Amino acid sequence: MNEVYDVYYSTGGAQLVGGGADVWVNNWIEEVAPHLDTKPILLIHRTRRGLAEITEHTKTFENNVKAGRGGNEGREVVKKIKKNYKEVLNTELEHLWQGDDPQKFRELLKGARRINILHGYYAPHKFIVENKEKIHSNVIHVSVRDCLKASMVLDLDRSLHTLMEQTWEDELCEVATHPIWIGVEESKLKYPTEHLPNYYEFKNNLDVTDSNRIGYASRMETRKCPHFLEGLDSMVFTNLRHIKWWEQNLNTDTSSWKKFGFTYKFLDNFMRKDWGISHSAHIFEPFGYSIFQAVDYGKIPILAPDWIPSYDYPFRAASPEEFREQYKKICELSVDGRRDYVFPLREYLNKTYGDKDVWREKMLRIYND
């Protein structure tokens, strides 16, 4: 390839959405990629789900709805997920999944003018190591140091997180021309970073409800503190295998939880279910898409003390005991009482983190310099 191009490297996005970083990548595809000066090529370091698999999954769900197991909400979900691959990922953006052609994937990295990491692995991989002198930017979605110490802070014997190496995070911060931190607060990383917070668009703005059931729509990694829900009436939307990990490794009692296997396309359906309080007390939370979503859907959150601590909010918890205490206080609130907390919080978050145009322009200044 003789044409000059920049590689944008990711480990997720498109139809592979397992968390906030993948949402960030999809926002980048839609909002940033069309405005890049140098030809962009998106490389996704994963094996994509085939159309046949996606179609089969959708058909199974649709059959369940037709059999009366989904109701009106289910029928609406079916309408939303009848999308093919081209609609999930903008095909005007040249892209390649590593699983489709590993050799070409490697060659494209080698031939790039620059490499911009949108969301990388948290440990070294040869594809990046052998091209690290080309890294122009690296977007940091979570602090490895914080993730690794979460179990100690929470006084837990074991920890659930992806493969991580602190030295790799440090090295990427050193070699990247632009190390970018996306959290709501300034970075506390070892090396200086540029602070470009994510954005969230409030599109639902739903009213609160009087339901005292708790909802949890996050991964089950240790810093998310899912064990705070032990013994509480809860609806949990997450990876079911990871629930098993908590049961088997930390003897977490999940008998009071109603469990739903996470699939991103069903998120809206889950958020509209009958629950009114959000477990959003995730320690070391960088941005917190799930927190923004909870507030957007009218769920009153219990937050961690370290999430936007400058915002005056009474319902915060850093332990199971504190979580139960805050839960009881919220249960005593009237609907109007809940509105008094949710609506001002929504207004603050929208004002502070809701400007997509500002986010886009800041990103483009880095990529187009």
Per-region residue spans from a language model:
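Nucleotide-activated donor-dependent transferases that construct or modify glycoconjugates
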Residues: 1-18
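Conserved donor-binding/catalytic core segment of Leloir-type glycosyltransferases
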Residues: 8, 180, 201-224, 233-234
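N-terminal strand-loop element at the rim of the active site
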Residues: 11-16, 31, 35-93, 242-243
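A charged, aromatic-enriched C-terminal amphipathic alpha-helix characteristic of glycosyltransferases
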Residues: 20, 332-369
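Short beta-strand->alpha-helix junction loop in the catalytic core
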Residues: 145-147, 166, 178, 182-206, ...
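Conserved active-site histidine-acidic residue motif and adjacent donor-binding/catalytic loop
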Residues: 240-273
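Nucleotide-sugar-dependent
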Residues: 264-265, 277-291, 305-313
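Short hydrophobic beta-strand element within catalytic cores of glycosyltransferases
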Residues: 299-304
